[in-house]
Amino acid sequence: MTSRLSTVLLVCWWTLAACQDATPVQGPTETISTGRVLGKRLDVLGKSVDAFLGIPYGEAPIGELRFRSPVARQPWEGTYNATTHGYGCYQVPDESFPGFEGSEMWNPNVRLSEDCLNLNVWAPHPRPSNAAVLVWVYGGSYISGVDSLDVYDGKTLAAEEGVIVVSMNYRMGALGFLAMGDESAPGNQGLRDQALAFQWVQDNVAVFGGDPSQVTLFGESAGAASIALHMISPESMGLFKRAALESAGLSVPWGYYTVEEGTRRGMLLAAALNCDTDTGGSALSPSQVVDCLRRRDVVEILADQWVTTDYLDFPFVPALDGTFLTERPESAQQRGAVKDCELLIGSNTNEGTFFLIYEVPGFSKDSDSLLDRDGFGTALKYAFPRANSFGLSALDYQYTPWLRPNDPALLRDAVDQATGDYNFACPTYEMALSYARTGQSVYYYRFTDRASNNPWPAWMGVLHADEIAYLFGLPLHPEKGFNSQEAALSRRMMRYWANFARTGNPNGASGSDWPLYTVETQEFLTLNKSLVDGQITIGRGPFAQACAFWREYYPTLLTQTGDISEAERVWKQQFSDWSTKYMVNWKAEFDSYVNGKQCE
């Protein structure tokens, strides 16, 4: 008897769905469209919250469903045990800094499986009536992420603000974004997973006290980029009312590819797994390639899916498939062909540093990453691999700290600024401006607060994703190591986001801290601990100059210098060197002379 019980428990541990009836019904239960679910009641800072974790919203995308669009979950018999998180979707954990909290906090904390289409709901107890709903979409470069991370725990936001919080897992990497141009692997599987979860919210959130007509999507990085794509997709525009985007927008340069490029990358993956040709050496069709990939072990796919080599060029991303995405995101943005909704959007001070330490020469977590002029040029060349010599010279000129052009710390910070502007900050700025032009209500923020317990070195500043902990209320829990001011800032930010979800205005009914962002004023709110002391800092035109460079000058320069003759290229390069590098050297000599030193 003991042996048999042990076997049952072991099987349950490995596959929760197979044992959904094994747990006695103790705790809060609700009946949703697919059956009955059992949750657990939590005490959160003296308030009660019911958590329903790991609820399946899609069938397991395995076998013939691998690489296909998701299929809604069929009803089950009995009561589903939703007291623990479900499986996370397959990914490769970050092992760059073993044991280091700053990177380990983003690694999966649950078992991984292809059977990962599940979601979580946190609802206040007693149940509210027609409460606003906040649906979280995690980031992770479209290759990693899981909804069970401590930093994504929705219990505190639900408890403090009386809102319903939902989060979901979705497929990533090749499993989520392989695009081969036909129905066998149409592309955008991960985005369609998200949309299926949004539909689940529409169908079921009222059971938990939520209002399906008051759904706000919020997400960070690739999660925010995903939401931006839902804002232009004909397949998902009707599934939510508002959007809050952190550190990404429609024009992120890493956010999509054409089906042709997706197919090219898919064939590289196929070649690595011997799925590109038949036994006679003849090339396989895309559907035959996909059939072969379906028979490969998922671990093999994960091991070989990184088919790109450029910096911040993620291997499998959303595709312009003609159905979910019918035009280039930046074109839709320029035309104003976007969802009619209120928008909250912004970015952090140092968006680039987190990525620089992984790939760019001269940058390290374990040093101050100081750069000389040569190191500055090398870093720019690596961070912008598609720039020709004229583009690199323009970057050098635009981001050189001209007041002290040889200062190693300023040169380091300038590479962070260039990387952050291009990949994250300017896409948020451009989307805010575009939305404001359509007459929509837009609220822009700049998060500038470095937490007292931040494990990353001080030079890295306020990193990409640092704001997330504040939005989920982690600083309110003493064991997390934040101070009292950070806890107060977290309360303020949760209130802003919840007010936005309730009314479309982060200020709520009577506040006026956060000004409306308009084309004329371009005002934004600075989010840091000074807010706690009543010091409200309003900025204007956060990146107008820098983003004009990326929007207007830089792409035009690359286009116009892409096919010039060698003689003209050399002459222009020499002129560019004179206007940047040699001017820096001249200024250094002049400064030495002014300071009473002998020029050499």
Predicted ranges, named:
Residues 4-6, 12, 100-287, 323-326, ...:
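Serine-hydrolase-like catalytic core of hydrolytic proteins
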Residues 338-390, 534-598:
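C-terminal, loop-rich substrate-recognition/catalytic regions characterized by aromatic stacking residues
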Residues 213-215, 274-292, 304, 407, ...:
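Surface-exposed patches in mature extracellular/periplasmic domains of secreted proteins
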Residues 171-174, 218-222, 445-454, 512-520, ...:
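Short, solvent-exposed turn/loop segments enriched in Gly/Ser/Thr/Pro and often Arg
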Residues 251, 292-487, 496, 503, ...:
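Substrate-gating cap/lid region and adjacent catalytic-acid/histidine neighborhood
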Residues 50, 114-117, 192-195, 199, ...:
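A structural signal for well-ordered alpha-helical segments within the folded catalytic domains
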